[in-house]
C-alpha cells in the first residue's frame, strides 16, 4: 500500500501519524493492499480556492476527498477484482482543523486523524448528505478512530515494555561480567 503525503500548508504536522491512520482504516475496510492514496495539506487560502472550484462554496473547509471512481458505501477495491489501484486524493487544511480542534477540546493531531478517517471513508463511497447516510458514516468513523487510538496506545505500551526489558537484560549482562 502506497500513501504519499505532500505538506504545502506551512504547518508542521506528523506525516507519519497521518499515514498510520490512513493505512489502519484502509486495512480495516479490507481494501486491496495494492491501493494507493495521496494526501495533500494546504493553507486556508489554497483550500478556499479548491472549495470554491469544486464545491462552489466560499471559504476554506477542513477536508475534501477526490475519489478516482465513484463507489457505493461498502464498495471497495477488494480482491479478486480490485478495481482502481489509486483510491484518490484527500486534501486537509491543518490551519482550519486547528480551530476545530480547539473548539472540540482536543489536539490538532487528533482532529487531523479524525479528518483522515473521514476522507478515506469518502474515497470508499460513504457520504453524509442524507440523515441515514450521516448516521452510518459517522458511526463507522467514530469506531475506526477509536480502534486506531487504542491500537496506538497498545503499540506505545509495547514499545515501553520492550525498552524496559532491553534495559533490564543489559543490566543483568553487566553484572555477569
From Swiss-Prot:
It is found in: Cytoplasm. Pfam families: YbeY. Its EC number is 3.1.-.-. Its cofactor is Zn(2+). SUPFAM superfamilies: Metalloproteases ('zincins'), catalytic domain (SSF55486). The keyword rRNA processing applies. Zn(2+) binds at residues 118, 122, 128. One of its GO terms (biological process) is rRNA processing. Keywords: Cytoplasm, Endonuclease, Hydrolase, Metal-binding, Nuclease, Ribosome biogenesis, rRNA processing, Zinc. Gene3D superfamilies: Metalloproteases ('zincins'), catalytic domain (3.40.390.30). It is an enzyme of class 3 (hydrolase). PROSITE patterns: UPF0054. One of its GO terms (molecular function) is RNA endonuclease activity. It comes from the Bacteria. One of its GO terms (cellular component) is cytoplasm. Binds 1 zinc ion. Single strand-specific metallo-endoribonuclease involved in late-stage 70S ribosome quality control and in maturation of the 3' terminus of the 16S rRNA. Belongs to the endoribonuclease YbeY family. This is Endoribonuclease YbeY. The lineage of its organism: Bacteria, Bacillati, Actinomycetota, Actinomycetes, Mycobacteriales.
Amino acid at each position: 500500500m502506497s500513501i504519499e503525503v505532500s505538506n504545502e500548508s506551512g504547518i508542521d504536522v506528523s506525516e507519519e501519524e497521518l499515514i498510520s491512520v490512513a493505512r489502519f482504516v484502509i486495512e480495516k475496510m479490507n481494501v486491496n493492499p495494492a491501493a494507493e492514496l495521496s494526501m495533500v495539506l494546504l493553507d486556508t487560502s489554497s483550500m478556499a480556492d479548491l472549495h470554491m472550484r469544486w464545491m462552489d462554496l466560499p471559504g476554506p473547509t477542513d477536508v475534501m476527498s477526490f475519489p478516482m471512481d465513484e463507489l457505493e458505501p461498502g464498495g471497495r477495491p477488494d480482491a479478486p477484482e480490485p478495481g482502481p489501484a489509486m483510491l484518490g486524493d484527500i486534501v486537509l487544511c491543518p490551519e482550519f482543523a486547528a480551530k476545530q480542534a480547539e473548539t472540540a477540546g482536543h489536539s490538532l493531531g487528533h482532529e487531523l486523524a479524525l479528518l483522515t478517517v473521514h476522507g478515506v471513508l469518502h474515497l470508499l463511497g460513504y457520504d453524509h448528505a442524507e440523515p441515514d447516510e450521516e448516521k452510518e458514516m459517522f458511526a463507522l468513523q467514530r469506531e475506526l478512530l477509536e480502534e486506531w487510538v487504542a491500537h496506538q496506545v497498545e503499540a506505545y505500551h509495547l514499545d515501553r515494555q520492550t525498552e524496559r526489558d532491553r534495559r533490564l537484560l543489559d543490566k543483568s549482562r553487566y553484572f555477569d561480567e
